[in-house]
Regions:
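N-terminal donor/sugar-recognition subdomains of glycan-related enzymes
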Residues: 2-241, 248-265, 274-278, 285, ...
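Active-site/ligand-binding-proximal alpha/beta "capping" segment
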Residues: 320-379, 383
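Generic beta-sheet signal
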Residues: 112-114, 142, 269, 289, ...
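Short, conserved catalytic/metal-binding motifs centered on acidic residues
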Residues: 245, 276, 378-380
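Alpha-helix capping and helix-loop boundary segments enriched in small/acidic/polar residues
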Residues: 244, 260-263, 267, 289, ...
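Catalytic cores of enzyme domains
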Residues: 355, 364-442, 448-449, 455-472
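Proline-aspartate-enriched helix->loop->beta-strand connector
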Residues: 106, 283, 373-376
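Catalytic or ion-translocation cores adjacent to nucleophile or general acid/base/metal-coordination motifs
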Residues: 263-273, 278-325, 337-339, 346-347, ...
Length: 653
């Protein structure tokens, strides 16, 4: 039983003022519900001497309030003076936060608290309203973590930009009792920052491959049915989608899938397609998004009549072998685009856009949302190794490529099992896919009122899904035959195709020119800074000279930033480069120089980093120019074949 603490009317007013300023609605509600507390307020002679006694075990929040406050302040004003974001576990008496926020360098302090009675008491004693209102002080309750809260925190500014210097500080020894919660939270934040970094793109070469293959695939995309056509003819014609993945649990679900195939829309992964063909279960859609030639091999086959009425939906980045194999047997395919700056620059809006996630299962899930299904049923979505160490179902064609993976990953990525049956072994990639999936499932429920049923009956738990046997889903969700085959999808008229082919040619040709113009201008800025830097190292420590170089660097960075608005076609390859650079630069930014020599060395380091970055920018834009020149050829051939040469000439002039 908590202590009935008597607060004065002024203190109650203060509590309400703090509550009003809180932006975290769930926390606000929880704090309003508290009527008493196990904590006793202990006030010393000094204004800052505010302690709490936990009457359940007679322990104190602080052993010595003033000493601990001073020691923390000294550490933070020395080592972490320039940190834009600080993270604490435990609210304590809150005085440390008020003191630290006097420093304008600290833009935000994020506080995680498990025992919110502490906040309840302190909110009656001290005024945090302005810090809370401006969001410089942010409080999260670790008992009610919202998946979205953490994702948003870890992917937004400035938290994301400074994620490489993230660390979590315990407010006081009292909080060591929650060590499991602390470890869990820390693991979650580190993982969310990693996911965020990956979603920003961590590899410019990956982006380059995407651009190359997208440009190469343009003629195929424009001459086949569009995404707009798919939505206009197929949206809302079925309530339940079944998504078929290739996990070890798939085999046992195939007989039921065959029995109920006519009553649901079946989406399947490229890897499950040959398996369904073998069992003569016709999917409605087969999706593929990988850029590698190995994935194209799932289509290096001929299932004859079986393929009639299946629509193959490909991300417009796929390896050209994929379309080559599909064309060989006259299969119906379409290329669909995701949001990406080079793709958006071409403005071929009929052929996009939807976000496709990291894996083909995510892509299936997201397409099922856009086609307005009310229920989404997952099967074969293990995202974990089977007990015998198998990574996929036994019919999977690339099983040999995963040999030894179970041993490699053992005990590194364990996670909660489906049906709460203990733990299962997962992998780095599956963990990433699972987190991605959990975000999608939460989003589908919140924004589209879609229910996701995980009927895998094995593998890893996917938070947010309802776990049910596949038989239950079939009997309860699938009651009538759908009108299959669905309406046929048609390509655009020949005139419209020609218009888009020319438009695409014009845009790609312009982008080659953008690369050249940018490189020529950029190399001049680079040489100027490089020469100044060489002179600087030979001169005496010249502060004015350093400032001039840093100003030149800032101008050049502004030049790159402006591309976001003026030349989006260059940002797809520069985006990941810029992200990785900024994340690493944060480590130099927060160095706190104590002497003149320290300050000089910090500036030298800052300039060196930027020079290396500029060399990379130049190299990548050159690589894009060459890639476009090489991959525009299929587009040129298609235009010649359609006797549009003279228009091509006009574009080139």
């Amino acid at each position: 039983m908590g202590l009935m603490m008597t607060f004065t009317p002024t203190q109650k007013e203060l509590f309400n003022k703090n509550i009003e300023a809180l932006s975290n609605i769930l926390l606000k509600e929880s704090l309003k519900e508290i009527k008493s507390s196990k904590f006793e307020l202990i006030l010393g002679k000094d204004n800052l001497d505010i302690n709490l006694k936990d009457t359940s075990d007679n322990t104190f929040l602080y052993e010595n309030v003033i000493d601990e406050l001073n020691s923390m302040l000294n550490t933070y004003n020395d080592k972490y003076l320039l940190y834009p974001v600080l993270y604490f576990y435990g609210f304590g008496n809150g005085i440390l936060f008020k003191a630290l926020l006097q420093n304008k360098n600290h833009q935000h302090i994020v506080v995680f608290e498990k025992d919110i009675e502490i906040i309840w008491v302190i909110f009656h004693i001290l005024d945090f309203s302005s810090e809370l209102q401006s969001a410089r002080l942010m409080i999260l309750n670790t008992n009610k973590p919202e998946i979205q809260d953490y994702n948003e925190l870890c992917s937004s500014k400035p938290f994301f930009q400074f994620s490489r210097i993230y660390f979590l500080e315990l407010m006081s020894h009292y909080y060591e009792r929650f060590h499991e919660d602390v470890l869990e939270l820390n693991k979650k934040l580190v993982q969310d920052f990693k996911d965020s970094i990956l979603s920003h793109g961590n590899d410019p070469l990956d982006a380059l491959q995407g651009i190359e293959q997208f440009v190469y695939n343009l003629p195929q995309m424009i001459t086949h049915p569009s995404y707009k056509e798919l939505l206009s003819k197929r949206k809302g014609i079925s309530d339940t989608a079944i998504i078929v993945s290739t996990g070890p649990s798939l085999t046992k679900q195939l007989p039921l899938l065959k029995k109920y195939a006519s009553k649901a829309t079946i989406f399947c992964a490229d890897s499950s397609y040959p398996i369904l063909a073998k069992h003569n279960i016709k999917p409605d859609y087969v999706l593929s998004l990988e850029r590698i030639p190995l994935t194209s091999e799932f289509f290096n086959n001929d299932f004859g009549e079986f393929d009639k009425d299946i629509v193959f939906v490909l991300k417009s980045y796929v390896h050209p072998h994929t379309t080559k194999y599909l064309q060989k047997n006259n299969r119906n395919f379409m290329l669909v685009s995701t949001y990406a700056s080079f793709i958006n620059y071409l403005k071929l809006d009929d052929f996009g856009y939807f976000n496709m996630g990291f894996s083909v299962a995510n892509m299936n899930f997201l397409l099922a949302i856009h086609l307005k299904h009310k229920n989404i049923v997952l099967i074969g979505q293990d995202l974990a190794y089977a007990k015998d160490g198998l990574s996929h179902t036994k019919d999977y064609s690339n099983l040999d490529k995963h040999e030894g993976h179970f041993q490699r990953d053992k005990n590194k990525y364990t996670t909660q099992a489906y049906g709460d049956n203990g733990k299962v072994e997962s992998s780095f990639v599956w963990t990433l896919f699972r987190h991605n999936f959990e975000q999608d499932v939460a989003n589908a429920k919140k924004n589209y009122y879609i229910t996701t049923y995980n009927c895998t009956e094995g593998g890893a738990r996917i938070e947010g899904t309802i776990e049910k046997p596949f038989l239950w889903a079939c009997e309860n969700l699938l009651d009538k035959d759908l009108n299959k085959p669905f309406e046929k999808l048609e390509p655009l008229s020949l005139n419209k195709q020609n218009e888009f082919l020319l438009k695409a040619y014009y845009k790609v040709y312009q982008s080659i020119k953008h690369c050249r113009d940018f490189s020529n201008k950029f190399i001049k800025s680079y040489k100027k800074i490089k020469n100044s830097f060489v002179s600087l190292q030979n001169s005496q420590e010249n502060e004015i000279f350093i400032q001039e170089i840093i100003q030149d660097i800032d101008k050049t960075k502004t030049q790159i930033d402006e591309l976001y608005n003026t030349q989006k076609d260059l940002m797809q390859i520069l985006g990941p480069l810029l992200t990785q650079f900024e994340l690493n630069l944060a480590r130099i930014y927060v160095l706190n120089p104590k002497t003149k020599e320290d300050a000089f060395n910090k500036s030298i380091l800052w300039i060196k980093e930027h020079l290396e970055f500029m060399e990379l920018v130049y190299g990548h834009i050159k690589a894009q120019e060459n890639a476009l020149i090489k991959n525009i050829l299929p587009l040129e051939e298609k235009l010649k074949e359609r006797k549009l040469d003279k228009w091509m000439e006009r574009v080139r002039k």
